[in-house]
Amino acid sequence: MPYKIFVTRSIPDAGIKLLQANKNVSLDIYERDQQIPRKELLRRVRGADIILSILTERMDKEVMDAAGPQLKMIANYAVGFDNVDVKEAARRKIVVTNTPHERV
């Protein structure tokens, strides 16, 4: 069964192509270059194994609850991770990463 990855905003095509090349990945991408409305974020993360987020989206307990217990990783497409509740993620054994160079 493929990993479900939800991408919270448009990222460079090279990154999307890299993810699409993996046959073990099912992608759901919020295709707009603006912040996803919170209600839509909570709906679309359901069942995600991985959330690829942008710094403007809060990755907190509410998002982790909405995603479900199978959530394994929050990959932040940003230099930092101030938007992620790292303590809550650690409690759930969810890996949190960032991209210090922000280039694909």
What are these regions (language model features)?
Residues M1-A48:
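N-terminal glycine-/charge-rich "phosphate-binding" loop or analogous flexible N-terminal tail
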